Amino acid sequence: MTVFKEILDNIANIKNVESYQIENIHLTSDDVLKRVIIISSDQNVEYGIRLEEDKKLMDGDILYKDDYKLVVIRLELSDVLIITAHTIGEMAKIAHNLGNRHMPAQFTETQMIVPYDYLVEEYLQDNKALYERKKIKLKEAFKHCSDAK
């Protein structure tokens, strides 16, 4: 079994992608947080992945590349709640409440994105928050804030 220990590049940076045979390794956002991953590709080849602790896999990362072939990480769609608040105060209240639940989150300029949870959805409905449930491809996995000490 081949064990990958580094990320070589990302498929977004490769010119003439169509000239390569692409073997995909499909991972969930939970998988990419693991230190050691044993998984089969879409071509039924078993691989191991063990990256340095500070390295995290992202969609499109290339683990193997030669003149003809790429082995690429593909993150599966994640079931999420995308929250867009009416005001900054409302967003602060929602973020505080979800933080009390130790809910991991990602943020854009105008949105808070959290993994789907029926209790969180119920809270948002009860508080008449603007949100939508969607399946999206995350750029990186949900994780708890590493800045919190």
Swiss-Prot record:
Q: Does the keyword Methyltransferase apply?
A: no
SUPFAM superfamilies recorded: Urease metallochaperone UreE, C-terminal domain, Urease metallochaperone UreE, N-terminal domain
Q: Which UniProt keywords apply?
A: Chaperone, Cytoplasm, Nickel, Nickel insertion
Question: Which Pfam families does its entry note?
Answer: UreE_C, UreE_N
Query: Which SMART domains does the annotation name?
Result: UreE_N
User: What family is this protein classified in?
Assistant: Belongs to the UreE family.
Q: What does this protein do?
A: Involved in urease metallocenter assembly. Binds nickel. Probably functions as a nickel donor during metallocenter assembly.
Q: What is this protein called?
A: Urease accessory protein UreE
The source organism is: Ureaplasma parvum serovar 3 (strain ATCC 700970)
